[in-house]
A protein has these predicted regions:
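Extracellular/lumenal ectodomain signal focusing on beta-strand-rich modules
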Residues: 29, 57-60, 96
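Generic helix N-cap/helix-start motif at coil->alpha-helix transitions
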Residues: 1-3
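Short, solvent-exposed aromatic-acidic interface loops
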Residues: 97-102
Length: 102
């Protein structure tokens, strides 16, 4: 089980294909980056996760559960090893995540 409850909820939402739960764990102004470039969160998640059957298999976690190594797969790109880093706001919701291939 993942240590950080917000990160755990986000991973569960991704793996369930639950867009509503995914956005529910984010702050309204959440941001993200992919391979070092800021992206439009809504467009990116629609394309890479919810429109493509995205799935996260966790290899490891660090930084109190806010940094993950993940085997991420989707119908567009197949499977790749990725790093994910999360910033969690005081209200317990994710305000930013960064991902990229390792």
């Amino acid at each position: 089980m993942l240590t950080d409850p917000a990160v755990r909820a986000l991973v569960a939402a991704v793996n369930a294909g639950d867009r509503e739960a995914f956005h529910g764990v984010l702050t309204p102004d959440a941001t993200m980056s992919d391979d070092g470039s800021d992206r439009d969160l809504q467009q990116w998640t629609d394309r890479e996760i919810f429109g493509a059957g995205g799935h996260m298999d966790i290899e490891s976690e660090s930084e109190d559960g806010r940094s993950l190594i993940v085997r991420f797969r989707n119908d567009t790109w197949g499977e790749m090893r990725t790093a994910w880093r999360f910033e969690v706001a005081e209200n317990g919701r994710i305000s930013r995540f960064e991902t990229g291939q390792t």
